């Protein structure tokens, strides 16, 4: 069976197995994300403590991702992913059991979030660079777009299901079902033949590998641009796990089910953007499109600061979802293509560092501003900061020669 052009990466059998497993496990992961935020607000009622949770979960990405990117180039990627996926499943199971039996406290959630962040620091660059091993450069654009579509389809399904389950059965179900969802991707990895073999020279130190990756990335003007754009949008826009629950509880006054639908609106928009990119055959970075997407996403945050209606919030979150994923997926694809095979894990670790490593700062600031002022003020401040930074990057790009 041959898949149509828009799904052509699925013609690779191992990628197809990996893709199906990722879809299921990511639905579970989004269920956990919603459940975790709701649980913290139930336990503490504090926007600052919710923001601190995000800081703890993503701090390991900031601290260690450049080293784990070098690790991804040194070890068989399939085996690394087996270890990380099993570990994530166990962490979800532990949290679910603590909640089920009424023993959970805020510090439990923080410790488990920190451990999850440590595992994800290894998992994310390995998973990103493994895609190229599964499909080759010819289909990498389509594969990255399909991955984005899967991730964001899960962002639709997971929050809706989690919201309904939390409202009906309790928050523990989000964590227990997430643990169960990882059995599919673990089974897929066990059946795959592609190992994602190491590509670095033997006898070199990991620090030398890290230095080589950093030097290469900083020497290429286009990669510097991509990383700067990614930094701005990740820092200001992608704090949905803090923005949206606070909006739901403090501004819109909706229950867990309403919160789930708000998170799903972001996912619907993101899937729309990802599928649009998936039909592109030529992986050229169209800078005007990417910059426009960034301005729309940050402008959407400014508009969200004035929103008090549930349906308007859904529409605005959809727009932010479309625009933000166009920028992020374009950066992901362009970085994959710009990196030589031997350096891809290290270059993608910089993607992970910026995309995930900004969350400790962004989520803490959103929580802090929301507690001191309001979540609407946090939206406004982030939006204005993002628009200003993007304008400065545009001026830099036009003034610096090739």
Predicted regions span which residues?
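Helix-loop boundary and gating motifs at the non-cytosolic
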Residues: 2-59, 219-264
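Transmembrane alpha-helix termini and helix-breaking/packing motifs in multi-pass membrane transporters
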Residues: 37-44, 96-101, 157-177, 250-251, ...
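Intrinsic disorder in cytosolic terminal tails and internal cytosolic loops
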Residues: 1-8, 208, 396-402
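C-terminal transmembrane bundle of multi-pass solute transporters/carriers
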Residues: 62-67, 74, 80, 94, ...
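Hydrophobic/aromatic positions within or immediately flanking transmembrane alpha-helices
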Residues: 19, 35, 51-54, 81-82, ...
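Substrate-agnostic recognition of the 12-TM MFS/MFS-like secondary transporter fold
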Residues: 16-34, 56-72, 76-91, 108-166, ...
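Helix-loop junctions on the cytosolic side of multi-pass membrane transporters
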Residues: 129, 133, 175-205, 394-402
């Amino acid at each position: 069976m041959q898949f149509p052009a828009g799904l052509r990466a699925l013609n690779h059998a191992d990628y197809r197995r990996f893709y199906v497993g990722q879809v299921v496990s990511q639905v579970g992961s989004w269920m956990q994300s919603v459940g975790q935020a709701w649980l913290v607000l139930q336990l503490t009622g504090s926007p600052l403590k919710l923001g601190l949770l995000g800081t703890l979960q993503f701090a390991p990405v900031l601290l260690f991702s450049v080293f784990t990117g070098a690790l991804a180039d040194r070890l068989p990627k399939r085996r690394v992913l087996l270890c990380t996926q099993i570990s994530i499943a166990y962490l979800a199971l532990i949290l679910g059991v603590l909640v089920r039996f009424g023993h959970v406290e805020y510090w439990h959630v923080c410790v488990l979030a920190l451990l999850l962040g440590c595992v994800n620091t290894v998992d994310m660059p390995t998973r990103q660079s493994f895609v190229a091993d599964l499909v080759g450069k010819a289909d990498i654009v389509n594969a990255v777009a399909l991955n984005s579509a899967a991730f964001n389809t899960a962002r639709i399904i997971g929050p809706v299901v989690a919201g309904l389950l939390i409202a009906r059965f309790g928050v523990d179900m989000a964590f227990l079902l997430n643990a169960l969802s990882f059995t599919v991707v673990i089974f897929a990895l066990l059946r795959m033949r592609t190992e994602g073999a190491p590509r670095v020279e033997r006898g070199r130190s990991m620090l030398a590998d890290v230095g080589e990756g950093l030097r290469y990335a900083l020497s290429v003007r286009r990669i510097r641009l991509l990383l700067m754009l990614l930094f701005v949008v990740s820092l200001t826009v992608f704090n949905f796990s803090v923005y949206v629950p606070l909006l739901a509880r403090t501004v819109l006054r909706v229950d867990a089910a309403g919160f789930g639908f708000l998170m799903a609106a972001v996912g619907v928009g993101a899937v729309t953007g990802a599928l649009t990119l998936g039909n592109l055959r030529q992986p050229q970075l169209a800078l005007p499109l990417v910059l426009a997407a960034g301005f729309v996403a940050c402008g959407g945050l400014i508009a969200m600061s004035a929103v008090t209606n549930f349906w308007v919030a859904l529409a605005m979150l959809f727009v932010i979802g479309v625009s933000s994923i166009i920028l992020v997926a374009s950066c992901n694809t362009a970085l994959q293509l710009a990196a030589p095979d031997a350096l891809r894990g290290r270059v993608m670790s910089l993607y992970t560092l910026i995309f995930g490593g900004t969350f400790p700062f962004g989520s803490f600031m959103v929580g802090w501003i929301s507690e001191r002022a309001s979540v609407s003020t946090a939206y406004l401040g982030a939006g204005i900061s993002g628009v200003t930074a993007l304008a400065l990057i545009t001026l830099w790009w036009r003034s610096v020669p090739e």
